[in-house]
From Swiss-Prot:
Domain notes: The beta-hairpin motif is involved in DNA binding.
Protein species of origin: Streptococcus pyogenes serotype M2 (strain MGAS10270)
Name of this protein: UvrABC system protein B
Name of the gene encoding the protein in the UniProt record: uvrB
Alphabetized NCBIfam families for the sequence: PRK05298.1, uvrb
Pfam families recorded: Helicase_C, ResIII, UVR, UvrB, UvrB_inter
């Protein structure tokens, strides 16, 4: 069993003090948590500092906390913010470690088997190991995760029990330590010393934990006793300092001992025999042969190496679970009394609900056609009700909480006041007849004031037609459609802020990262067409895009007033009234948010120009120029990964592959 370090309280460091209605929200949330309330909602309007409020709550209740976001980008932003707020505590990041992932699948209609194809991001793998190690070693831990945290991870008990604990003066031979390291999936590599490896130099063993980046450990022996343990720089070998206790966790989350492995293999073989009998009785000889060949190969690898590609598909047998029993996940690494915060809960809870069904449909096809044993179905994400069973206390955070969250609790804490004094925008409803000319007039007013405009439409055709019309009228406009990738999207937002163009048109402008303080007008076309983007929640989210500018204004073009429109307008008016009263009582003058315009990471050729597929004619390049471009792209890919922009890193990787294929 791992001895946890002495309890260390969360220590929040910030130049800000709670303001507006943050103090009331923080106090209510903390009182409810300490009073044993299971679920509550923080209903925070856009730009009110919800992350800061979450940080204050964490520091006051002092519990290990899991923060779940609905995508990697948002998780990365939150991770960065929490790291700044809690520099002395363990703030960890846990998302899917794939830069690119094509799951194993089979398409019967075309008899196409798609092999699992993936590219693992080494940095994220390190961060995942760091998260699980921190959870087992200490209590002052915040883990920011995507919904990957509800996917199977391996048994925390096996993971903890397999850990190697070392102290100076401990009696253990060098060879015994080497065998223990191999058992927990460390590799000996005396030349290329990297994460998950160890090297041996006489009576000195150097180990590079899977959870570390630049620092490794040197274990010095005197006979069959540990003489000294030092932390070292992995690159130079320079000693940083001595340590009195070192815990080495396994280099993979799926780990088991020899005895347990043989038991697991016996179960796999029994299931294989049963499934082969079923296939043969149904005359499915091809499926039977395929399953026998694949499974026997995996068994051989497990026996010889203790690991095989796709080992997670046998996790039910490895963990000793019954059929249908939920897998171990990151949630099982937390102690019983921990806090969960769901960011943008109206999106995230929907994802948690939907993960299971999509996973099962794909895997069932693999089982039916002999690519996997039925137990592979139990390597899966949690069902929503299984996730709920892990919840001790939970806070749903959203500007527009969903029906699910509202059904879980009646405790709703509002955070409506913005520290900047900014108000929710005023809203006009205008008829759709003559909307083009009316909109053009409004845009021209904004252009004259050096302000920007968002226009949201319901269809691609409408967006394209409107873009063409505004261009003919001399307006600098761009249309952001679903085919635009992360890098281009970032460039478009930057160019809008810089004034390269004045109007951005899109179908769904609710995605994170679209908060642009320069936008003073949001126009919603077809506002009376009920649906996902025109329901109350969608409208409030869209209205919030104009809440970053002191002159923020929203125009809804509609021929009738729908219930969703009325509720969104009423809710915005209610919030605006509260904000005006607060500003008046405290003498606050609203100010537009000041937000730096961040430059993009540049990919240099020699002139440091951005390289993109559209701008560079790769086919006309010489082999040397292509090699130079590949080197530049690889550097950019690493920089993007370090900045946690993994979508951009994946695009860079795809571009590199295309260039390599040209040679």
């Amino acid at each position: 069993m791992i001895d946890k370090r002495d309890d260390k309280p969360f220590k929040l460091k910030s130049k800000y003090k709670p303001s507006g209605d943050q103090p009331q929200a923080i106090e209510s949330l903390v009182d409810n948590i300490e009073g044993g309330e299971k679920a509550q909602i923080l209903l925070g309007a856009t730009g009110t500092g919800k992350t800061y409020t979450m940080s204050q709550v964490i520091s006051k209740v002092n519990k290990p906390t899991l923060v779940i976001a609905h995508n990697k980008t948002l998780a990365g932003q939150l991770y960065g913010e929490f790291k700044e707020f809690f520099p002395d505590n363990a703030v960890e990041y846990f998302v899917s470690y794939y830069d690119y992932y094509q799951p194993e699948a089979y398409v019967p209609s075309s008899d196409t088997y798609i092999e699992k194809d993936s590219s693992v991001n080494d940095e994220i793998d390190k961060l995942r190991h760091s998260a699980t190690a921190s959870l087992l070693e200490r209590n002052d831990v915040i883990v920011v995760a995507s919904v990957s945290c509800i996917y199977g991870l391996g048994s925390p008990k096996e993971y903890a029990d397999s850990a190697v604990s070392l102290r100076p003066g401990q009696e253990i031979s060098r060879d015994t330590l080497l065998n223990q390291l191999v058992d927990i999936q460390f590799e000996r590599n005396d030349i290329d010393f990297q994460r998950g490896c160890f090297r041996v130099r006489g009576d000195v063993v150097e180990v590079f934990p899977a959870s570390r980046d630049e620092h490794a450990f040197r274990v010095e022996f005197f006979g069959d006793e540990i003489d000294r343990i030092c932390e070292i720089e992995s690159l130079t070998g320079k000693t940083i300092g001595e340590v009195d206790h070192l815990v080495l966790f396994p280099a993979t989350h799926f780990v088991t001992n020899d005895e347990h492995m043989e038991q697991s293999i016996a179960k796999i073989q029994a299931e294989l025999a049963e499934q082969l009998q079923l296939f043969e009785s149904e005359g499915k000889l091809l499926e039977a042969q395929r399953l026998r060949q694949r499974t026997e190969y995996d068994i051989e690898m497990l026996r010889e190496m203790g690991y095989t590609s796709g080992v997670e598909n046998y996790s039910r047998h490895m963990d000793g679970r019954s059929p249908g029993e939920p897998p171990y996940t990151l949630l099982d690494f937390f102690p019983e009394d921990f806090l969960i915060m769901i960011d943008e809960s109206h999106m995230t809870m929907g994802q948690i609900k939907g993960m299971y069904n999509g996973d099962q449909a794909r895997k069932q096809m693999l089982v039916d056609y002999g690519f996997r044993l039925p137990s592979a179905l139990d390597n899966r994400p949690l069902r929503r009700e299984e996730f709920e069973s892990h919840v001790h206390q939970i806070v749903y955070v959203s500007a527009t909480p969903g029906e699910y969250e509202m059904s879980q609790t009646n405790t709703i804490i509002e955070q409506i006041i913005r520290p900047t004094g900014l108000l929710d925008p005023e809203i006009d409803v205008r008829p759709s007849m003559g909307q083009m000319d009316d909109l053009l007039g409004e845009i021209n007013q904004r252009v004259a004031r050096d302000e920007r405009t968002f226009i949201t439409t319901l269809t691609k055709k409408m967006a394209e037609d409107l873009t063409d019309y505004l261009k003919e009228m001399g307006v600098k406009v761009k249309y952001m459609h679903s085919d635009i990738k992360t890098l281009e999207r970032t460039e478009i937002i930057r160019d809008l802020r810089l004034g390269v163009f004045d109007v951005l048109i899109g179908i769904n402008l609710l995605r994170e990262g679209i908060d642009v303080p320069e936008v003073s007008l949001v126009a919603i076309l077809d506002a009376d067409k009920e649906g996902f983007l025109r329901n109350e929640r969608g409208l409030i989210q869209t209205i919030g895009r104009a809440a970053r500018n002191v002159d923020g204004h929203v125009i809804m073009y509609a021929d009738k007033m729908t219930d969703s429109m009325q509720r969104a307008i009423d809710e915005t008016a209610r919030r605006r009234e509260i904000q005006i009263a607060y500003n008046k009582a405290h003498g606050i003058v609203p100010q537009t948010i000041k937000k730096d315009i961040r430059g993009l990471i540049s990919i240099s050729k020699t002139s440091h120009n951005d390289i993109s597929k559209e701008e560079m004619d790769y086919e006309s390049m010489s082999r040397g120029e292509r090699k130079e471009a590949i080197n530049a792209l690889q550097k950019q890919m690493q920089e993007a990964a370090e900045l946690l922009d993994f979508e951009l890193a994946a695009q860079m990787r795809d571009l590199i592959l295309e260039l390599k294929l040209m040679d």
